């Protein structure tokens, strides 16, 4: 191993690092970013960062090897062109939603697929997932379901009190 080029060692480290990230992530989405400006990519990175997600741009060969090492399948024929991987560490839908919003805003951004719950998701499934509210939105919906009956009782009691007060 003494004659191994430093670039090969570096690439192996990149593959191992990315494979670990993919294994520990909740979900990730692969998309072709060709045509996005630096400002667009920075804005996407900021949105992803706010939900504890990250954007990685790697060579396709390194990405393919990381997928293989992490046990990810479904992207075998998808890694052509300049691709990026948005990885969600906490909220499963956050990265998928952010990239899907960018793809809807810019027609030239092509989503290749996503990986969620150890399954490949195609673009049709991604559209369905992106329609789901985020974790905070779901919490607020759940909270409103709990508070609605109490609110109705309060309004009823207030109406009865007003009638008796007249």
Curated annotation (Swiss-Prot):
Superkingdom in the source lineage: Bacteria
Alphabetic keyword roster: Ribonucleoprotein, Ribosomal protein, RNA-binding, rRNA-binding
GO cellular-component term (any): large ribosomal subunit
InterPro entries: Ribosomal_uL10, Ribosomal_uL10-like_sf, Ribosomal_uL10_bac, Ribosomal_uL10_bac_type, Ribosomal_uL10_CS_bac
GO MF entry, a single one: large ribosomal subunit rRNA binding
Matching Pfam families: Ribosomal_L10 (PF00466)
One GO process term, biological-process aspect: translation
Record text on subunit structure and interactions: Part of the ribosomal stalk of the 50S ribosomal subunit. The N-terminus interacts with L11 and the large rRNA to form the base of the stalk. The C-terminus forms an elongated spine to which L12 dimers bind in a sequential fashion forming a multimeric L10(L12)X complex.
Record-stated family: Belongs to the universal ribosomal protein uL10 family.
Role: Forms part of the ribosomal stalk, playing a central role in the interaction of the ribosome with GTP-bound translation factors.
HAMAP family with a match to the protein in the record: Ribosomal_uL10 (MF_00362)
NCBIfam families the UniProt entry points to: PRK00099.1-1
Protein's recorded name: Large ribosomal subunit protein uL10
The species this protein was found in: Ureaplasma parvum serovar 3 (strain ATCC 700970)
